[in-house]
Amino acid sequence: MNHSHKCMMLLMISALFATGISAQKYKVKSIAWERLEVTAALDSAPDSDAFRIVEPYKAKVDSTMMPVLGLSRVPMTAGRPESTLSNWAADVLVEGSTATGLETADMGLVNMGGLRNNMPEGIVRRGDVMLISPFENRLVVLEMKGKDVKELMDNIASVGGEGVSSSVRLVITKDRKVAHVTIGGKEIEDGKVYRIATLDYLAEGNDHMTALKKAIKRHSLGMLIRDVMSESIIKNRVIDSKMEGRIIVQQP
């Protein structure tokens, strides 16, 4: 068989395979998943050589992740429109806003997407906080005019809610519009300047929080969010959180 015949045969075979494959249609019948923590308990017969290599690094990781910071009275989770974990986190940012001598922020804001794990009930270790806030986000305090804070509330309503501090009461409609909002029990004044404690990531207008880019002044406190959280737990020793109606979706 000459070269041209071989090429022709290969092309015909390839075409047959392609036709056969494209003719088959696959449909997903079901999807199931479970969370499986990969720990040493899964390894019934650990490799001694691998263990010797890993052990020094494991010791370093354990020294970072295992220290106890305090206790949590309840398990905390994140979710819209309001949740125990986002409530606690937003309040912690307000608490941390005074670290460099600034006045206490009028409002704290965290994004649900930035809270990557749950807070356990009982003992809270440094590793738990690192899992909740694994990113290199830092605390900033923004000064904003009231009219722009109103726009920020529109941003929050448009995504169905984010984590806001205890000073905020926001009612949103089913179609994600602001029905009513107050800060510190008062309606927002267009000309007043408000201080917002939040993440530098959100301050750039990310996660639909575009109004934050209109801040008239920005104070970068330099502290990682997870460090702010850790210091708050150490300071308070026992933490707690509950649903307070900070963000409510109107029912028809």
Regions found by a protein language model. Name each.
Residues K25-A41, S83, N87-P252:
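Feature captures C-terminal
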Residues M9-A18:
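Bacterial N-terminal signal peptides
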Residues D49-A59:
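Post-signal-peptide N-terminal segment of Sec-exported extracytoplasmic proteins
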